[in-house]
Amino acid sequence: LHLLAVRVAVLGFGWAGVLAAGFLLERFPGAEVVAFEKSRRLGGLLSSAEVNGFTFDVGGSHVIFSNDKAVLAEVVALLGGEALEHRRRAYVRLGDLFVPYPFENGLHVLPPEERAELIGDLVEALMKIPPGWRPRHLLDWIETTFGSGIARRYLIPYNEKIWKRPLDQISADWVYIPGRLPVPDVKTLVKTAAGIPTVGYVENSRFYYPRRGGIQRQYQAALERVRDKVAIRAGEAVKEVRRRGGRLVVNRVEVDLAVAAMPLPDLIAAFSDAPEEVVKAAERLDYNQVVVVGVALDRPAPDQHWIYVPDRRIVFHRYAWVSNYSPSNAPPGRSALIAEITLPRGVEPDLERLKAEAVEGLLELGVAQERDVLHVEAWLHRYGYPLYTLDHAQNRDAVLRWLREQGVVAVGRWGQWHYWNTDKVYKNVKETIAAL
């Protein structure tokens, strides 16, 4: 592309969209960039809300970490010295025990017999893996890699809870994204079996978080770089996209190029002339909604960051003490917690009921007592987690191929339909814009 005096549309202005605008302006300083965002409020899944002196990350628990040192340095640099560094204190709640995360590193806290059984299963499973094995689906990957004990106690119930689907209907593709799910290593297992603490999943064993303003500050820092140079149409959803000659028309705005950072099904629905097979492929892209329940507590937080909860009786799959991410997220002596609940697409959530169930779950786990609860809020994101169904790759490829032919480049979690953290999104957007 020879882009100097060119007009580019950015479709969707969450984390991927705001980064795309920034990289476009660096690459083509003369470009005119117009951004469409359906929400009046900017931030996407990196949104935070302040309620009575408590700050909640309303898109779920997000922290800054990466196994890519350059990406990590760039994202932390965005915060301009306003980033706090933490050593991860994450746990899996098993019965009354807090097992340090990753689970296979944390088993040293279990009684010796139980430890021996789970690690015995795991080693046996690893010894049986044939060379060149590829998992047929997520259930196959869990059972083959971790053995029946860890699968049954933790990974199956936890993953069924977050994905809300039978695990033999979820592809194992996403566990091949390096840095997405920790896989056990034998020396670590021997130490764990002997009851020696070890650290796993080193990429996020240290993480960063904004000093003030919640995780939204990460988004704001990227926004501040482009705000004066981009025409941001907040509260304007992408309703219509069509080709006119060699250009694209987005909601009646004519552009030379579009960078899509919005959910693919909504984008394809905006094209009146998309071929039927592309429309069908986009409709088959599955996802879960996420409801985030924020709870303000009149007590200090324990020395923990986030906790995975495989227990099927509890509605949320994870809760996080966001006031431990930054002390400015709660008044002194009090704490702010968020609990995350997924729902299949198309389900109309009853937020009042989910708030009540989340509080019940926290009481049941002994995380809080009724008298500690000051107030409870809930936020819904229709697009929470992209799902890796078994036909995910072919549907995604069909949609992306057709979009490229139309002159639309797709980026980010929702444009690429990948379960990416903010670091993977950063790298994807940067590389995509550099290749234009």
PLM regions: where:
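N-terminal Rossmann-like FAD-binding beta1-loop-alpha1 element of flavoenzymes
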Residues: 6-35
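Conserved Rossmann-like nucleotide-cofactor binding loop
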Residues: 16, 41, 265
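Glycine-rich FAD pyrophosphate-binding loop
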Residues: 25-51
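Mid-domain catalytic core of redox enzymes
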Residues: 27, 236-352, 356-366, 400-402
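Conserved flavin/dinucleotide-binding core of flavoenzymes
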Residues: 48, 102-103, 321-436
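Dinucleotide-binding Rossmann-like beta1-alpha1 core, especially the glycine-rich loop
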Residues: 52-130
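Feature captures the FAD/FMN-dependent oxidoreductase FAD-binding
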Residues: 70-103, 146-152, 225-234, 239-249
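Active-site/ligand-binding neighborhood in enzyme catalytic cores
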Residues: 114-240, 261
